[in-house]
Amino acid sequence: MPPHFIDGEPHDHQHDRPRRVRVAGEPVRIGIGGPVGSGKTALVAALCRQLREELSLAVLTNDIYTTEDADFLRRHAVLPDERIAAVQTGGCPHTAIRDDITANLDAIDDLIAANPPLDLILVESGGDNLTATFSSGLIDVQIFVVDVAGGDKVPRKGGPGVTFSDLLVINKTDLAPMVGADLGVMRRDAERVREGRPTALISLTEDPSSGPALEWVREQVRTLADVHQ
């Protein structure tokens, strides 16, 4: 796998998590998880706005009892309505992305059938704690989003999402002075617990493109699907 470039630094970490067996021509699937309020849906919206002119993409959201996140994306017209789908998990949000992924797989099949050909599907989990991870049978790579508002201790606390995601996004860096968070400490702690896996610090307020997270997604599509722009 080519090295990741996050904040200008190369990363060539070979991940230990088993990979989904991909079929030629299938869209790349990227999971986006993280706690409630960390900015997952805002990141999905930013990625859609930046990528919709260069890739054929769709979004699948997960909510417990509503379709709120999908409705938000439709209201903001980040993609045509038929490219946005929702799964109502009806219970713990991590169950639908890790333990019983049937509803998500069915929804992905429907998106692929309705929007051929797709290059990329973003799968957003429902809000959960630091333990949520995606099944490797559902997605190819996963992003985990935390935010600065929780304080600079969040990366240090670890958890499967923080430690083992393919990309850790530390969001809302513009709030650091207001909550007394040290971004240098957060970066250092993330690098320590993640053992070389890349971390991106972003502020969608200051850079609506999502900066390094966007470039990482582009790299994954190029690497996994051989989509050349």
Swiss-Prot record:
A single GO molecular function term of this UniProt record: GTP binding
Region (Disordered): 1-20
UniProt keyword annotations, A-Z: Chaperone, Cytoplasm, GTP-binding, Nickel insertion, Nucleotide-binding
One Gene Ontology biological process: urea catabolic process
Binding site for GTP: 34-41
Known role: Facilitates the functional incorporation of the urease nickel metallocenter. This process requires GTP hydrolysis, probably effectuated by UreG.
Homology family: Belongs to the SIMIBI class G3E GTPase family. UreG subfamily.
The protein, known as: Urease accessory protein UreG
Species the sequence originates in: Rhodococcus jostii (strain RHA1)
